[in-house]
Amino acid sequence: MRILIENVSVFQEGDILNNKNILIENDIIKEISEDKNFEKIDYVIEGKNKIALPGLVNTHTHLAMTLFRGFADDLPLKEWLEEKIWPQEAKLTAEDVYWGSLLGICEMIKGGTIAFADMYFFMDEVAKAVSESGVKASLSVGMIGVSGNENEILNRGVNFAQNWHNAENGRIKVMLAPHAPYTCPPSFLEKVINKAVEMNLSIHTHLSETYLEVENIKNIYGLTPVRLMDRIGLFNVPVLAAHCVFVDDEEIEILSEKGVGVAHNPQSNLKLASGVAPVKKMVEKRVKIGLGTDGPASNNNLDLWEEIRLVATLHKGVEKDPVCIPAKEALNMATKNGMEILGFENSGIIKEGYKADLILVNINKPHFYPRHNLISHLVYSALSSDVDTVIVDGKVLMEKRELKILDEEKIMFEAEKRAFDLIKKR
C-alpha cells in the first residue's frame, strides 16, 4: 500500500517544514519531499492547511476506568479509592474491561493519541481491543504483591507477557507491572526484577505519587521509594515510573543515571491533590519524561493536548520561570520521548525510514490565526478536535474525523450500558 499525503506542513525535530509531500509505503515513511511525481499511488490524502506530526503517546493510564468517568469526583484520595472505585472494580468482568478499553481507544484516536501504556485487570481484553483497533500499546497486568501468593501473582504477569509481547507485528509490547512500593514488598519486587531480566522485559510501576506514600515507605524501610527501588536493583532494568511527584535532587540524579523513564501526569496529580512533580529539575538532569493522563476516572479524559498545554504552563507558574518547558519540549515529551519510553523504536519522529505513525492536525481554524508560530499554536492553542487524520503503521485509523476501523456508536452504547449495570450490581 502506497499512500501520498500532499501539500502538508511537517513538524520534524523541532521545526515546521512547509509544502511537503509524504510518501508512505506499507508501514514506513518512504520519502518526504517537494516531489509529487510518485508512481503507483494507492491512496491520496490532501494535506493543505494541515500539520503532520508524530502521533501522541500516553505513557500512563488505566484505560478501562473510562467506565468510572464522573462516577466519583471531588473526594479525598482515600475515600475516592476505598469507598467508590475499589468496590466497583471488584465487580468488573472481562467484557466490561473490553468495552471500557475500546471506549478509551476511540477517545484517544479521535484526539491523535496512537500509543499508550496501560496497567490494569483482565489485560487479555485490553490486548484484544488494541489488536482490533490498530493502535500501539505497552500493556501490563497490575500486580499487587501483598494480595496473595507472590509466585501466583507474578505468574499472571509472566503468562500475559508470554502471550502478547511483540504481538500484532510489534504493535503490542508487554511490561511487568508491580503496582507500587507500598503494595509490593522487596521480596516480591526482587522476583519481578529477576523475571524481567530473564524475559528481557521492562517494568512499569507507580512511584512517589503522594507525600503519604513517601512517608509510609520511609517509616517502614528507612528509605524513600526511589532510594529503596535503587537499593533492591529495580532500576537495573528499563523502568517506566509513573508520577515521581515527591522526589528530591539526589533521587532525580538516580533517575537520570539509571535511565528511568518518568510518566508525568500533571492533570491527574492536580485533581487528586497529589502535588506537582519537579519536572524542571528532571529536564535539567536529562531525565526522560513522557506525558500521561492517568486513569480517566481521575482526570477525567484521555486528552493529551490538555497535558501538553498543562506541562508547558504549570511549571512556568510553579517555577516562576516563563521559559521553563518551552513548546518544543512539551511536544517532544508527548511524542518522541513517549515512544522511546514505551519501547517502540523507529517511531516518534516524522522522518524517512521511520514508522508511518503520524497525525494530521487541521490548522484552518480561527484559533490557529495569525500563524506567527505554529509550534506555539500546537501547544497553547490546539484542541483534540483539531485532529483530522490518524495513521499507525501506515494504516489509516481516522480520516476527516471519521473512525475507519472501530464502530464508535456501538462502543459508546455498550460502554454506557455496562457502566450503569456495574453500579447497580450487588
From Swiss-Prot:
The keyword Oxidoreductase does not apply. SUPFAM superfamilies: Composite domain of metallo-dependent hydrolases (SSF51338), Metallo-dependent hydrolases (SSF51556). Binds 1 zinc ion per subunit. Keywords: Hydrolase, Metal-binding, Zinc. Gene3D superfamilies: Metal-dependent hydrolases, Urease, subunit C, domain 1. Coiled coil: none annotated. Its EC number is 3.5.4.28, 3.5.4.31. Catalyzes the deamination of 5-methylthioadenosine and S-adenosyl-L-homocysteine into 5-methylthioinosine and S-inosyl-L-homocysteine, respectively. Is also able to deaminate adenosine. PANTHER family: AMIDOHYDROLASE-RELATED DOMAIN-CONTAINING PROTEIN (PTHR43794:SF11), AMINOHYDROLASE SSNA-RELATED (PTHR43794). This is 5-methylthioadenosine/S-adenosylhomocysteine deaminase. It comes from Dictyoglomus turgidum (strain DSM 6724 / Z-1310).
